[in-house]
Amino acid sequence: MNPLKKKPRSKNLNPTVPLPDWMKVRVSFPTDSDALSVVRAEVESKELHTVCESASCPNLNHCWNRKTATYMLAGDICTRRCQYCDVAFGKPKPLDSLEPERVARSVQSLGLRHVVLTAVNRDDLKDGGASHFAETITKIKTYHKDCTIEVLIPDFKAKEDSLQILYAAKPNIINHNIETVESLFPTITPQKNYKRSLEVLAHIANHGFLTKSGIILGLGETDEDVNQCLMDLFAHGVRMLTIGQYLQPGPTHYPVQSFVRPETFVMWKETAYKIGFKTVASGPLVRSSYHADEYFHEESQILPTE
């Protein structure tokens, strides 16, 4: 499978909720600018996957032009079917044992100063894919020591052993997205559990790692829901936060319930800072990897040391 194969970009597919002017931005497949060509060639030549493509991220052009990308490990088939997500659901293939090496070589070749690693849920694996994350981190440190590493992880079913495997590799930032408010979990992401995700985040923070999470709006949440979610995240050790607008990936996905106005995202950013979060990215097109390198360097003084 060619991970760079063209696919329809995210758009509003709910006719009852018109696409507002502030969401009408160009999100077409990238053209062949020099920076885009470099990233595309790297990913394609090493047979890698990026979440930029697999999840139809609206910031693909912007990030690839900056020579940044989020690598998606462990294949492109997920064992969970979340209603908001564009990653394919099904039975995954066995892990590719050479993938960590290829990712590390790609990071080295691109000269990245900050890399984000994520993965599909691999509930078919005993450790949920934690060892695969750890090996990739270790390989990157071997080939490109100056690159800082952020991981965006599944919940690993809150397994202590899986989390410890990840910790041993010493990534700089560990992100686990809460995604939505507690009341919507049964509908939006029934194979996940709100309190379990909070437990995972607290576990990460308690082990000294800079802890990050994110929420998407427009799924039917109330302001009270969002405020409580932010309070919960902070209480469980999260200090880096992203807040973005949900975009319906396809006709079978959960429909957009509302488009949150830009000034409301500003309000939530101000609220989050008042709660105590250290860095907050909040806006209609913000995603969990949005300007991750810049936010990392803002917070580098509180990262764990080797």
UniProtKB/Swiss-Prot annotation:
Positions of the Radical SAM core domain: 64-278
Record pathway: Protein modification; protein lipoylation via endogenous pathway; protein N(6)-(lipoyl)lysine from octanoyl-[acyl-carrier-protein]: step 2/2
Keyword Acyltransferase recorded: no
EC number: 2.8.1.8
Database matches in InterPro entries: Aldolase_TIM, Elp3/MiaA/NifB-like_rSAM, Lipoyl_synth, rSAM
Swiss-Prot/TrEMBL cofactor(s): [4Fe-4S] cluster
Residue sites binding [4Fe-4S] cluster 1 per the record: C52, C57, C63, S289
Transmembrane segment boundaries: none
Coiled-coil annotated residue ranges, if any: none
Pfam families found in the cross-reference section: Radical_SAM
Protein name (record): Lipoyl synthase
Species per Swiss-Prot/TrEMBL record: Leptospira biflexa serovar Patoc (strain Patoc 1 / ATCC 23582 / Paris)
Source species taxonomy: Bacteria, Pseudomonadati, Spirochaetota, Spirochaetia, Leptospirales
Gene name per UniProt: lipA
